[in-house]
């Protein structure tokens, strides 16, 4: 998992409340057993005028001209500015996979669905909760200034834009994991030597548990 320390990036809007995980990555793309390949279909039903299917060549599909992420001014955006209850709906982990692969490093919103919020930290995305009034001001600044960027410092827990700095809360353990790029597997591997020692001791004390064939 990619570590997150500081990041300065172009901001793109998702100016609607209650964006659910089916909008983030529609259900027909969940058939894959891999965790990669979802980025091209992030927000598929909003980005395109037709219905997408797995493995389809998106280059020939008609784009929705009204969807902000299709606008030239937001190309290359790495910070998504959203409204309340972002990531609601089903608990599919494919949603943060798709957003991260699309190019986003952080999402700023007044609130997130709990499971989606947790999944973001496990997949290298930083979900930031700011007061709704602050989010409103960021939307206004973004719409008025093409190329609007935000600077995020996870260690300091700050968001800075246009000379204004805002602080956000984050659980210390989640912060530690994201700063160091630790997902569940890499955290476990930190204790690999202890695990191997424990398994060796169990094989000696309880060998019957490890017999391939029980007599």
From Swiss-Prot:
GO cellular component entries: 3-isopropylmalate dehydratase complex
The record ties this protein, via InterPro entries, to: 3-IsopropMal_deHydase_ssu, Aconitase/3IPM_dehydase_swvl, AconitaseA/IPMdHydase_ssu_swvl, IPMI_Swivel, LeuD
The pathway where this protein functions is: Amino-acid biosynthesis; L-leucine biosynthesis; L-leucine from 3-methyl-2-oxobutanoate: step 2/4
Pfam families membership:
Aconitase_C
Q: EC class of this enzyme?
A: lyase
User: Reaction(s) catalyzed by this protein?
Assistant: (2R,3S)-3-isopropylmalate = (2S)-2-isopropylmalate
The protein's UniProt keywords, in alphabetical order, are: Amino-acid biosynthesis, Branched-chain amino acid biosynthesis, Leucine biosynthesis, Lyase
Instruction: Point out the coiled-coil segments of this chain.
Output: none
SS bonds (residue pairs): none
Annotated GO molecular function terms are: 3-isopropylmalate dehydratase activity
Q: What is its EC number?
A: 4.2.1.33
Q: Among the record's GO biological process terms, what is one?
A: L-leucine biosynthetic process
Q: How does it assemble?
A: Heterodimer of LeuC and LeuD.
Instruction: Return the NCBIfam families for the record.
Output: leuD, PRK01641.1
Q: Which PANTHER family match?
A: 3-ISOPROPYLMALATE DEHYDRATASE SMALL SUBUNIT (PTHR43345:SF5), 3-ISOPROPYLMALATE DEHYDRATASE SMALL SUBUNIT 2-RELATED-RELATED (PTHR43345)
What does the sequence similarity comment in the record state about its family? Belongs to the LeuD family. LeuD type 1 subfamily.
State the protein's purpose: Catalyzes the isomerization between 2-isopropylmalate and 3-isopropylmalate, via the formation of 2-isopropylmaleate.
According to UniProt, the name of this protein is: 3-isopropylmalate dehydratase small subunit
């Amino acid at each position: 998992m990619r570590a997150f320390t500081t990041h300065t990036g172009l901001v793109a809007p998702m100016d609607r409340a209650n964006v659910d995980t089916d909008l983030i990555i529609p259900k027909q793309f969940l058939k894959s057993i891999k965790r990669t390949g979802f980025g091209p279909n992030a927000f598929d039903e909003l980005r395109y005028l037709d219905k997408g299917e797995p493995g389809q060549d998106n280059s020939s599909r008609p784009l929705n001209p009204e969807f902000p992420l299709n606008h030239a001014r937001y190309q290359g955006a790495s910070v998504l500015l959203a409204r309340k209850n972002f990531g609601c709906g089903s608990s599919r982990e494919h949603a943060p996979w798709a957003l991260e692969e699309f190019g986003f490093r952080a999402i700023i919103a007044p609130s997130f669905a709990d499971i989606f919020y947790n999944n973001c930290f496990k997949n290298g995305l930083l979900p930031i909760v700011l007061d709704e009034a602050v989010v409103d001001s960021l939307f206004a600044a973004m719409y008025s200034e093409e190329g609007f960027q935000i600077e995020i410092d996870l260690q300091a827990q700050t968001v800075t834009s246009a000379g204004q700095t805002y602080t956000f809360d984050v659980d210390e353990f989640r912060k530690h994991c994201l700063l160091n790029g630790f997902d569940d597997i890499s955290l476990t591997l930190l204790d690999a030597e202890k695990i191997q020692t424990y398994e060796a001791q169990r094989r000696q004390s309880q060998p019957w548990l490890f017999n391939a064939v029980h007599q």
